[in-house]
């Protein structure tokens, strides 16, 4: 992945907009985020409005470094160890919040999610914006709530857009996102670490770093981004099927005269009826994750009657991809 050189004038303009309560789409290594000043209640509420997101659905505060953690949350030895190892990077830590963190950020909960992104543009923006006051940016994915996340600036422009016709004040174009799916989210607020959302930082990596088992979160865990049953969804109805079932389903729907868009391993293409769009699924979890939202956008743009997606392998390294596909087709 090639990242465009940082445009310092654009960063300065973005800081100016954020300082007065505006909204800026910024690139991260995961997906594009819709940034607002986390200390500015009205700016954060405008983020919810722009996305059509329920205000009880908590946001992640993005910070410039691990040194910002104590300003926003009650840190723990586990949080400090993980931040040393994986920050900047695609790991979000959920901790008990400090009074400084407004309830408009946390969805009314007593916990806050924190992340330090590694994308050069995001890092430059956070350093310029944060300053000695340790300010942070809320930055949910820069798309309409529940829809496909954006992995490039074009996705943001096509969905939310820039004023006056759109909803945002600025889009920073930092190229295509490296990982393409949202960060791993780990709850450290309840005594034992638990995974709220799967991502590039895997369970095995977390367990190795912490020296303990890290299960999936239970029903009593804090509410968190990306945990709704239906999420990341294309507008076209989509189905997730095992390979043989997908072949049979494609033939049945084709016989009914439906126009199909399919994402599956290349080896299945010859076994399918004629389809409007066929996307060859990558064979590695990391490549698939980086490509996933771009592929979903392309499948949706085919204006098919149905999207069919072959289920990925049921192995630990595919957990994040499997999670996103399951929610996108729910």
Cite the ranges covered by each PLM segment.
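Active-site-adjacent structural elements in enzyme catalytic cores
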Residues: 1-330
């Amino acid at each position: 992945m090639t990242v465009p050189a940082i445009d310092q004038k654009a960063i300065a303009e973005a800081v100016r907009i954020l300082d007065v309560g505006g909204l800026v789409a910024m690139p991260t290594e995961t997906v594009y985020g819709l940034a607002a000043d986390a200390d500015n209640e009205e700016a954060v509420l405008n983020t919810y409005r722009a996305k059509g997101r329920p205000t009880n659905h908590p946001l992640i505060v993005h910070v410039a470094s691990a040194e910002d953690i104590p300003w926003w949350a009650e840190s723990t030895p586990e949080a400090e160890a993980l931040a040393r190892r994986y920050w900047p990077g695609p790991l979000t830590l959920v901790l008990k919040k400090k009074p400084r963190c407004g309830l408009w950020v946390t969805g009314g909960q007593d916990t806050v999610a924190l992340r330090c992104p590694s994308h050069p543009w995001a890092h430059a923006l956070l350093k310029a914006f944060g300053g000695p006051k340790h300010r942070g940016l809320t930055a949910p994915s820069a798309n309409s709530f529940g829809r496909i996340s954006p992995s490039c600036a074009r996705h943001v422009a096509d969905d939310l857009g820039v004023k006056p016709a759109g909803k945002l004040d600025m889009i920073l174009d930092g190229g295509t996102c490296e990982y393409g799916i949202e960060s791993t989210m780990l709850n450290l607020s309840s005594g034992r670490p638990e995974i709220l959302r799967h991502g590039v930082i895997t369970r095995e990596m977390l367990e190795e770093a912490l020296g303990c088992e890290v299960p999936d979160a239970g029903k009593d865990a804090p509410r968190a981004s990306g945990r709704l049953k239906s999420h990341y969804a294309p507008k076209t109805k989509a189905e997730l099927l095992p390979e043989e079932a997908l072949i049979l389903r494609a033939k049945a729907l084709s016989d009914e005269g439906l126009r199909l868009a399919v994402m599956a391993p290349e080896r299945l293409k010859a076994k399918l009826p004629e389809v409007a769009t066929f996307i060859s699924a990558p064979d590695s979890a990391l490549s698939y994750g980086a490509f996933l939202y771009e592929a979903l956008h392309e499948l949706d743009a085919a204006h098919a009657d149905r999207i069919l997606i072959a289920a990925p392998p049921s192995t630990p390294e595919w957990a994040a991809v499997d999670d996103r596909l399951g929610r996108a087709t729910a």
